[in-house]
Design a protein with these regions (language model features):
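Hydrophobic beta-strand scaffold residues
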Residues: 13-15, 66, 113, 207
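N-terminal hydrophobic targeting/anchoring segments and the immediately downstream early-domain regions
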Residues: 1-36
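Short, conserved phosphate-binding/catalytic loop or strand-edge motifs used
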Residues: 72-82
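Alpha-helical scaffold segments that flank or form the walls of functional sites
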Residues: 43-64, 146, 226, 230
Length: 249
C-alpha cells in the first residue's frame, strides 16, 4: 500500500516507520533482524550498519523513506520501560559508533533518519505514555554522554531529530534561570530545542515530536495550549494527533 501510494502520488510522500530492528517495522513480512542491544552485544559496531541496511532497504522497498531510528538513548537504568533493549547499551562511545553506522546504511538506501529521543532517555523509570520523564544529568554530565552522541550524529549527517517528552532541568535552568520548578518536556521547551539543540549543537535539520498522544506531552499543559506552544518552542512537525480539527484550530 505504501509503495503504491508513493508511486502514484502527484506529490512525493514522506512515509515514516520505526525501522529500529529490521524491515518488520513497516512490512508484515519484513526481516526482524534483532534489537539494538543484541547488535551491541556482538561487540562489532559494523553489525549496526548491517541492521541499518536490512531495515532501510526493506523499508524503502515498500515505500518508506524515513526511519524513526536509530534509538540513541543510553541504558543508564535497566528499569526504564521505554528504552532498555532498544538501545545500544550503556557506553556512549558504542552508542555513537553504532548510530553512525546505521546512518551510513540508511543514506545508501536514500532513507532519512530520525535520531531519538532528544534530549536523551534511559535515566529514570518513567513511561512517557503516562508521565513526562526526566534526564537528570548535570550539564557537564550531559555533554560527556548524550551531548557527545548527538553532536557526533549531527556531524555524521542525521537529517532529523525526534524529540521525546523528556525534561532536562539542568540545561533548562542554564538557558533560562527563571525556568519554573516543574517538569516541562523538551517538546515544549525552547531552552532545549532552540538553545541546546539548535544553538549549542548546531542542528539545522527537521525537529519532529514523539507521539503527541502520550500523556508525557499533555500533562504539562492542556493540549489546546500545548500544540501551539510546541510550535513556538521549535517543533517543526508533529507525530500523530488526537483530533485533527481541534489541533488545527
Amino acid at each position: 500500500t505504501h509503495r503504491y501510494l508513493q508511486e502514484h502520488s502527484k506529490i512525493p510522500l514522506l512515509v515514516g516507520a520505526n525501522l529500529e530492528d529490521g524491515g518488520c517495522g513497516i512490512a508484515t513480512d519484513g526481516t526482524q533482524y534483532g534489537k539494538q542491544m543484541q547488535i551491541a552485544a556482538t561487540g562489532d559496531t559494523e553489525d549496526a550498519y548491517r541492521l541499518g541496511k536490512v531495515s532501510c532497504s526493506e523499508g524503502a522497498a515498500v515505500g518508506c523513506n524515513w526511519a524513526f531510528a536509530p534509538v540513541v538513548d543510553i541504558d543508564r537504568n535497566w528499569r526504564n520501560p521505554i528504552t532498555n533493549v532498544r538501545t545500544y547499551g550503556d557506553d556512549p562511545d558504542r552508542v555513537l559508533a553504532c548510530g553512525v553506522n546505521y546512518i551510513k546504511a540508511a543514506k545508501e538506501e536514500n532513507v532519512l533518519v530520525a535520531i531519538k529521543h532528544f534530549p536523551g532517555d534511559g535515566c529514570d523509570e518513567v513511561d512517557q505514555h503516562i508521565l513526562t520523564s526526566v534526564n537528570s544529568l548535570s550539564c557537564e554530565e550531559w555533554d560527556a554522554t548524550y551531548g557527545k552522541i548527538y553532536s557526533g550524529l549531527i556531524q555524521a549527517g542525521a537529517q532529523t531529530v525526534m524529540v521525546g517528552h523528556i525534561a532536562q532541568p539542568a540545561y533548562q535552568k542554564a538557558y533560562n534561570p527563571d525556568f519554573p520548578d516543574k517538569l516541562v518536556p523538551a517538546t515544549l521547551s525552547p531552552e532545549l530545542l532552540k538553545g541546546l539543540l539548535r544553538k549549542k549543537l548546531g542542528f539545522n535539520g527537521l525537529i519532529v515530536t514523539d507521539s503527541t498522544c502520550m500523556v508525557g506531552f499533555s500533562c504539562a499543559m492542556e493540549r489546546e495550549k500545548a500544540v501551539p506552544y510546541a510550535i513556538e518552542a521549535g517543533c517543526d512537525m508533529f507525530l500523530f494527533n488526537k483530533d485533527l480539527d481541534e489541533d488545527y484550530r
